[in-house]
Amino acid sequence: MIRAIIQYETEPDSERYAQHIAEFVQPIECSAFRHGKVFGSPFGEPACRYVAEFEWDDMESFKAAVNSDAFAASGKDAMAMGIPFTVHFASIE
């Protein structure tokens, strides 16, 4: 299983994020997408306040998705929200 993990520095506006999902996330081919608030950390303040995850069954599906116009457009729109974020790709066993 492959995941793209997006960590937002602050929580996005709920209406704006709903628009982002409807217009830019839903067109991306993936087996699952989830998102939510970060509510804590065992080591003081959390490093981020909101997370999102895309999930793919295999590397081939992941590569097809991240090289798509839809994935690029989603990243551009995420940047347009003006919230600093990081993206990590992970292979989950």
PLM region spans:
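Short S/T/G/P-rich N-terminal loop/turn motif that feeds into the first structured element of a domain
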Residues: M1-N67, V87-E93
